[in-house]
Amino acid sequence: MGALLALLDPVQPTRAPDCGGILTPLGLSYLAEVSKPHAEVVLRQDLMPKEPQTCSLAPWSPAGTELPAVKVADLWLSVIPEAGLRLGIEVELRIAPLHTVPMPVRISIRADLHVDMGPDGNLQLLTSACRPTVQAQSTREAESKSSRSILDKVVDVDKLCLDVSKLLLFPNEQLMSLTALFPVTPNCQLQYLALAAPVFSKQGIALSLQTTFQVAGAVVPVPVSPVPFSMPELASTSTSHLILALSEHFYTSLYFTLERAGAFNMTIPSMLTTATLAQKITQVGSLYHEDLPITLSAALRSSPRVVLEEGRAALKLFLTVHIGAGSPDFQSFLSVSADVTRAGLQLSVSDTRMMISTAVIEDAELSLAASNVGLVRAALLEELFLAPVCQQVPAWMDDVLREGVHLPHMSHFTYTDVNVVVHKDYVLVPCKLKLRSTMA
């Protein structure tokens, strides 16, 4: 398949993929299978000639013939490497002229399809070639001629290839849903944009995507990844329908955007009061004549970074924690730099969303940044404030991402049998497709 998500244009670094995926031949087979009932409905409509304009209220039936029963005996999709798809359909009809035995008819359709990307960036499935054949299952010559006459009146073959891709389950609607705008938080959204038409190979259909993030409707210019993302060759024995790939840069850009949106500006409660803190830092007692609860106000002083290693994901955070008292008039008397050099991340998938939770802060250091109460040793800072920082910062970040992050997906399908595999620099998400119950 080659590099799936290689850097497309080094002159324009903003046109670099950070995620993508491949729909496997097994996934194509599943899409074909669930399209059968839909194809039968469409064929019932398209195989009939247009009803003549008349004022009669009596039911219309061409040439005294009952409308046919339609059964899609087979529908399949296969990849034509470097070209597109081949669609095959076998349709069985039973046409019943009045007062005669129903006549079996078989229609075979072979169509070549391809995907184009329009100037607006939307992908569209189009027909390259289509070849329908119609055959009446009659052994006698006289019956065959009669059958052909009836077929010409009943079966409108010309309509079959006008838009044969619509026999699949709303393919262009599904392609458009890939690039919908998805919410992350109430004022933060993400959108996946196709960088080029998909690549067709024996492994399936590969599509590279770039994620754009918005805050309050404005696109956030995220930092450019120093290393272009490319997806490795996939195992030929995969039993998945779809394999998604998300780069380390994708996750870092997500946290960068949330930080720019102010989502990680947090208030951390503390068990301390000004009186108890004055026992450790004596100058606090001179600032407050009454006992007030201590509050920690934290914000990121630089952008967070996600690090993906083989088998694990971690988050690096660099915060400034302002320590003070007073509500609603919060006044800080101490500022601390909190460097979280490793916070474990847990990744999972629910429906079509990536769920991200901060498991535990494994390594953190506190140091004095500014003080109105004299010099405070780092050891004392950690004794007083490290525990609430390590407990409350992950909880706050988990709450921000509690709804999960929408993965690239087609609107009529959900993901099942999902396995999230963390590799160095990227995450693979092999899964199977399942038609939503509202569409089944």
Swiss-Prot record:
GO biological-process terms attached to the record: response to corticosterone
Function according to Swiss-Prot or TrEMBL: May play a role in the developmental transition from cell proliferation to cell differentiation during neurogenesis.
Annotated source species: Gallus gallus
Cellular component GO terms, alphabetical: membrane
GO molecular function: lipid binding
Keyword annotations from UniProtKB, A to Z: Developmental protein
Span of the signal peptide: none
Protein name, per record: Protein TENP
Transmembrane segments: none
Tissue: Expressed in developing retina and brain, but not in heart, liver or kidney. In brain, located in a narrow strip in the boundary between the ventricular zone (consisting of proliferating cells) and the intermediate zone (consisting of postmitotic, differentiating cells). Expressed in all major regions of the developing brain, including the myelencephalon, the mesencephalon, the telencephalon and the diencephalon. In the developing retina, expression is scattered across the retinal neural epithelium. Expressed in egg white (at protein level).
Inducers of expression: Down-regulated by dietary stress. Significantly decreased expression between days 0 to 5 in egg whites of eggs laid by corticosterone-fed hens (at protein level). Decreased expression at day 14 in the magnum of the oviduct in the corticosterone-fed laying hens.
Family matches, as SUPFAM superfamilies: Bactericidal permeability-increasing protein, BPI
